[in-house]
From Swiss-Prot:
<feature type="region of interest" description="Disordered">
    <location>
        <begin position="1001"/>
        <end position="1022"/>
    </location>
</feature>
<feature type="repeat" description="HAT 5">
    <location>
        <begin position="444"/>
        <end position="477"/>
    </location>
</feature>
<feature type="compositionally biased region" description="Acidic residues">
    <location>
        <begin position="1070"/>
        <end position="1081"/>
    </location>
</feature>
<dbReference type="Pfam" id="PF23233">
    <property type="entry name" value="HAT_Syf1_CNRKL1_N"/>
</dbReference>
<feature type="region of interest" description="Disordered">
    <location>
        <begin position="308"/>
        <end position="337"/>
    </location>
</feature>
<feature type="repeat" description="HAT 4">
    <location>
        <begin position="243"/>
        <end position="277"/>
    </location>
</feature>
<dbReference type="GO" id="GO:0071007">
    <property type="term" value="C:U2-type catalytic step 2 spliceosome"/>
</dbReference>
<feature type="region of interest" description="Disordered">
    <location>
        <begin position="1047"/>
        <end position="1081"/>
    </location>
</feature>
<feature type="region of interest" description="Disordered">
    <location>
        <begin position="526"/>
        <end position="546"/>
    </location>
</feature>
<keyword id="KW-0677">Repeat</keyword>
<feature type="repeat" description="HAT 13">
    <location>
        <begin position="892"/>
        <end position="926"/>
    </location>
</feature>
<comment type="function">
    <text>Involved in pre-mRNA splicing and cell cycle progression.</text>
</comment>
<dbReference type="GO" id="GO:0071014">
    <property type="term" value="C:post-mRNA release spliceosomal complex"/>
</dbReference>
<feature type="region of interest" description="Disordered">
    <location>
        <begin position="1"/>
        <end position="27"/>
    </location>
</feature>
<feature type="repeat" description="HAT 6">
    <location>
        <begin position="479"/>
        <end position="514"/>
    </location>
</feature>
<dbReference type="Pfam" id="PF23231">
    <property type="entry name" value="HAT_Syf1_CNRKL1_C"/>
</dbReference>
<comment type="similarity">
    <text>Belongs to the crooked-neck family.</text>
</comment>
Length: 1081
């Protein structure tokens, strides 16, 4: 538009405003407003220096002359403009004294007369410059910024600070996509400015500024910064409504039409902010236009829709309630369309997120978006969803379409389904690009049930509890309680987790309680009111009471069904859970029909390879159920305190069904269990059942059938899981053990021997089986066959298993024959010791030596004991030497033990060598060989630390006091110092270690009580801490008994010879802690 035409329009507007002001009534406030308004206009028409002498002060005449001489020199114009800004514009000028505070606030930056003059001077110089340079962008930009400062106010921190803020925001946020709207909701645009001209008082200046922007855009229509600056003016809170509504919307549209598409998002950023501040239908239409270009901000648009919908739900005043019906209907229709539009948009976003074509700017998952849609549906059920009858018609129509036309898309709505009171619509057009369920402008309501089933339950099975309760809540909000109940029941029957079940059940129970409470309150209120028609009232009340009784009964049944419903959930989650099936049987109590049905269903559904442990127990319990005549028989059998006669009476009263039980066992033995032992347990329990009912022959036939091998047994391994358990069952030791026990109890000797021989043939017999077989033959007087079984056993097994067999074998052989077959016994002992490990030699050697002592030669016994000192392990060698010495002393005398002591000292470890030296020295002293004893003490001293092994040094000290001289005593002290230097270590560390060990041993002795009464207590100096520590360590380290009976080591012996034990007990006294060895003689 040309400038002259705009000036004429502005003058017309000014005259009209003046006429309105003149026609208004006079008042103090209006007088103040009129006084302020009279100051305007300042810039229209443009200030002319020829008509206003104040525009050019005397100091600026030289600059004016420079412009006259060089009118085309832009630098001269720029210098003059900078001079006027620096000399006239003040950032925060004080207002005029004649103005009140209120008037100064209305005028803002123009409250000072100097600033009004500065505005006129700036306008004059810029307009004259633009007449020379109408297309210069920098000139227009500076002019608009300076003019805007007088109208909009000063930016916070000044223009430089605002420029920095804009640059920083541009770096942090991109002008596209989800970050398009970066301002906080309800943010005031005016907070970025300080002050500003009131839109009513300074209407002329606001209009003049808008006209200036229009002129700039007429000359520079493609400059985006000019457009953005102009559009930002409409967001200012003091912008006049005449500019900030229709004019602003049209200006935004012109900007979008003028600027290229690459700059549109920068315009939309301001446009959408302006639309949100305007609100109403304008906001919705602007947002819809933008979402066609960029749907990424759909969530923001949905929040705007819901905010407007909630604003319409606010309580209205009495006057608004009295409006005509047409207007209220129109309002409800508009609000309903907003809720429906928001619902369809959210549904579309959720589906897009599920397909992976949409990512929420707020980081919401597809399920969160779907739950938001569900919550919106719960909040506005009448406006969004179909009625139950309409949903049924929808389903029928979908089925008809599928059968007639082959259509599989169940989401298409039939043409007869529409909102209440609307005309029929077509199902969908073939050319339509949007689905009716996600087309926001389509008024067709949604089939909520079908959507939740297809988009929710089928895709978010782990959140089914929330979805089912949401659907039920939707029907409750619509008043469809029966449909809600069916929904709860359907949810309970389909969920697979206890969490979802609990969520649904709690909501179901709470809803039932609320409905019952409401009906009871309603009946109570009706009982207090007096009605005219008593008969109708009575009939209505009876119907309501009947309905209340029905609902209360349903609620009680629901509470009673809860354990079964929880069990249903657990079985749906894992139908192979055997324990849950057992719990289900227990829940049915004495309902035999349900119990049988449950057992059969469990057997049918459980996969043996995936079943939890004890799947076989399910068959056993089922068989026992039939065996004892159902749940009543089982309950009587499990009752406590029942006598034998009472049990017989109960057995007579409740007859079992053995044929059905046998059928269950027949079914069980065909199941491919994971473990062979489970199948073996089935066979064993089957035989046990036959035994309980005195069917002994049937029991033996059952076990013989169970161990029957397959035709081809080659290559079958018991632990080969690739083969079915039925194929590997014939190698089950558990099954054979039960079979052989059954034969021993009910069969004859020959049949039992055949079973044992079959086990040995299959090489599945254990050492215990060998011993049991031999014991069975021995009990039946087959002694030699028993010994043959032992021989076969030691050939089958190696050590350490063979040790147990040898131990029992040798004990029984010696007990049977004694010295009658001595050479054979010797051969057996030599055979046992041939490959025996060192740790198992001691019991066999002691038994061998005892045999020679009792039935053979003492000399051979001594050789055996001497051989044992070399054959046994290091841990047993000391005890073996002590035993050997005791036997040698008792047989040949004390002097004969000297070579044994010498060999012991050479072969034993250092710690045991010192102990053996003490014994050797005591022996020599007993024989009167004092010098030999002293030499032995000196030899043993090198192994004894004086700090820790004080017993040795005390004994040597006492020995020297009693038998030595001053020289020998000094020699003993010299050796002690030498040894102490040899063991030179940290004394404090040793003391701490010894003290800790002593405290630990003392605590153990305190727990043992009086059992440690044999420990000797030495006299200890109470003032010496080291002595107390050593005494405690010495007490804790008390020596054990010197001799070990052979029977104590033979742990696997089935029966031990008491003679060996007696000898061992007698021998334990020999070589003990006694100083006197007269007991050896």
């Amino acid at each position: 538009m040309p400038p002259k035409m705009r000036s004429s329009q502005e003058n017309v507007a000014v005259s009209s405003d003046a006429t309105i002001q003149a026609s208004s009534a006079s008042s103090p406030l209006q007088d103040a407003m009129a006084a302020v308004t009279s100051l305007f206009p300042l810039t229209s028409p443009f200030p002319d220096p020829a008509k206003d002498d104040t525009l050019i002060p005397a100091a600026d005449i030289l600059l004016e002359q420079e412009l006259l001489r060089n009118p085309d020199n832009f630098r001269s114009w720029s210098s003059y403009i900078d001079h006027i800004i620096n000399t006239n514009v003040v950032k925060r000028p004080p207002p005029d004294v004649s103005l009140t505070t209120y008037q100064a606030a209305l005028l803002g930056p123009l409250a000072s007369s100097t600033q009004r003059t500065a505005l006129r001077r700036l306008t004059s110089i810029y307009e004259r410059a633009l007449a020379q340079f109408p297309t210069r962008y920098s000139l227009w930009r500076d002019y608009l910024q300076n003019r805007s400062r007088f109208v909009l106010g000063d930016p916070k921190g000044g223009s430089d600070a605002k420029r920095k803020r804009d640059l920083q925001a541009a770096r942090e946020k991109l002008d596209f996509g989800p970050t398009l709207i970066d301002s906080v909701e309800d943010e005031d645009f005016g907070s970025a400015y300080r002050g500003g001209l009131d839109g009513t008082v300074g209407w002329q200046e606001w209009k003049s500024l808008a006209a200036l922007y229009e002129r700039a855009l007429m000359w520079l229509p493609t400059m985006p910064r000019l457009w953005l600056s102009y559009l930002s003016m409409f967001i200012h809170p003091q912008c006049p409504p005449i500019l900030s509504f229709t004019h602003a919307r049209r200006t935004f549209d012109r900007a979008l039409r003028t600027l290229p598409g690459s700059l549109h998002l920068r315009v939309w950023k301001v446009y959408l902010k302006w639309a949100e501040r305007r609100g109403g239908e304008t906001c919705l239409r602007v947002w819809r236009r933008y979402l066609r270009v960029d749907p990424s901000l759909t969530e923001r648009y949905v929040s705007i829709l819901l905010a407007q919908r909630e604003d319409q739900d606010e309580p209205e005043g009495e006057e608004e309630e009295a409006e005509d019906d047409a207007q209220s209907d129109r309002s409800r229709k508009q609000s309903g369309s907003k809720a429906l539009e928001a619902s369809k948009l959210l549904l579309g976003l959720a589906r897009s997120a599920m397909d992976g074509t949409y990512v929420s700017p707020e980081g919401k998952s597809p399920f969160q978006l779907f739950v938001e849609w569900l919550e919106l549906t719960e909040k506005y059920p009448e406006e969004i969803g179909l009625d139950p009858e309409e949903e049924k018609k929808y389903l029928q129509h979908s089925v008809a379409l599928t059968s007639d036309n082959g259509m599989t898309n169940a989401r298409r709505a039939p043409r007869h389904i529409q909102g209440k009171g609307t005309a029929a619509r077509e199902i969908a057009k073939a050319s339509s690009s949007k689905h009716p369920e996600t087309d926001a402008l389509d008024p067709t309501r949604l089939n909520v049930t079908a959507i939740i089933q297809k988009d929710g339950l089928d895709k978010f099975s782990d959140q089914s509890g929330r979805l089912w309760t949401g659907l039920a809540t939707y029907w409750i909000k619509r008043g469809e309680f029966d449909v809600a109940r069916d929904t709860f029941e359907a949810g309970i029957q389909t969920v697979k987790t206890v969490r979802d079940f609990t969520q649904i059940f709690d909501a179901y129970a709470e809803t039932s309680e609320n409905v019952i409470a409401f009906m009871m309150d309603e009946l109570t209120e009706e009982g207090g009111d007096e009605e005219a028609d008593a008969e109708d009232q009575e009939e209505t009340r009876e119907d309501k009471e009947a309905e209340l009784d029905r609902r209360m009964q349903e609620f009680e049944e629901l509470i009673e069904r809860r354990p079964l419903l929880v069990n249903d959930v657990l079985l749906r989650r894992n139908p192979d859970d055997v324990q849950e099936w057992e719990k289900r049987v227990m829940l049915y109590g004495d309902n035999d029909e349900k119990i049988i049905e449950t057992y059969r269903e469990a057997i049918q559904k459980i996969n043996p390879r995936k079943a939890t442990p004890n799947f076989h127990q399910l068959f056993l319990n089922f068989a026992q159920f039939y065996e004892y005549g159902g749940s009543a028989g089982l309950a009587k059998r499990m009752a406590e305190g029942v006598e034998g006669q009472e049990e017989e009476e109960q057995a007579e009263q409740v007859e079992g069904d053995l044929e059905s039980a046998r059928k269950i066992f027949e079914k069980a033995i065909t199941i491919p269990f994971r473990r062979v032992d489970d199948l073996a347990e089935i066979w064993c329990e089957w035989a046990e059942m036959e035994l309980r009912h005195s069917n002994y022959d049937e029991a033996i036939r059952t076990m013989a059938r169970s161990v029957a091998p397959p035709r081809n047994t080659k290559g079958i391994q018991y632990h080969d899981d690739t083969l079915p358990p039925q194929t590997r069952l014939f190698k089950s030791l558990k099954l054979w053990s039960f079979y052989v026990d059954l034969e021993e109890s009910l069969g004859d000797v020959e049949s039992t021997k055949r079973v044992y021989e079959k086990m040995l043939e299959l090489k599945i017999a254990s050492a215990q089986i060998i011993i049991n077989y031999a014991a069975f033959l021995e009990d039946n007087k087959y002694f030699e066959e028993s010994f043959k079984v032992f021989e076969r056993g030691v050939e089958l097994f190696s050590y350490p298993v063979a040790f147990e067999i040898w131990n029992v074998y040798l004990s029984k052989f010696v007990k049977r024959y004694g010295g009658a077959k001595l050479e054979r016994a010797r051969d057996l002992f030599e055979q046992a010791l041939d490959k025996c490990p060192a740790r198992f030699c001691k019991p066999l050697m002691l038994m061998y030596g005892q045999l020679e002592e009792e039935h053979g030669l003492v000399k051979r016994a001594m050789k055996i004991y001497e051989r044992a000192t070399r054959a046994v392990s290091t841990d047993d060698r000391f005890d073996m030497y002590v035993f050997y010495i005791a036997k040698a002393a008792a047989t040949f005398g004390l002097a004969a033990t000297r070579p044994i002591y010498e060999r012991a000292i050479e072969s034993l470890p250092d710690r045991q060598t010192a102990e053996m030296c003490l014994r050797f020295a005591a022996l020599e002293r007993k024989l009167g060989e004092i010098d030999r004893a002293r030499v032995i003490y000196a030899h043993a001293s090198q192994f004894c630390d004086p700090r820790t092994q004080t017993d040795f040094w005390k004994e040597w000290n006492q020995f020297e006091i009693e038998t030595g001289s001053e020289d020998t005593f000094r020699e003993m002290l010299r050796i002690k110092r030498s040894v102490q230097a040899q063991f030179n270590t940290d004394v404090s560390y040793i003391a701490a270690s010894a003290l800790a060990s002593a405290q630990q041993n003392q605590a153990q002795r305190g727990a043992q009580g009086s059992s440690n009464g044999h420990v000797r207590e030495d006299d200890v100096d109470a003032s010496d801490p080291m002595a107390r520590v050593e005494a405690a360590s010495r007490s804790a380290g008390a020596r054990q008994t010197a001799f070990v009976a052979a029977s104590t080591a033979a742990s696997g012996a089935r029966s031990a010879d008491t003679t060996i034990g007696d000898v061992a007990k007698n021998d334990e006294v020999v070589g003990g802690d006694d100083q006197d060895d007269q007991d050896l003689l």
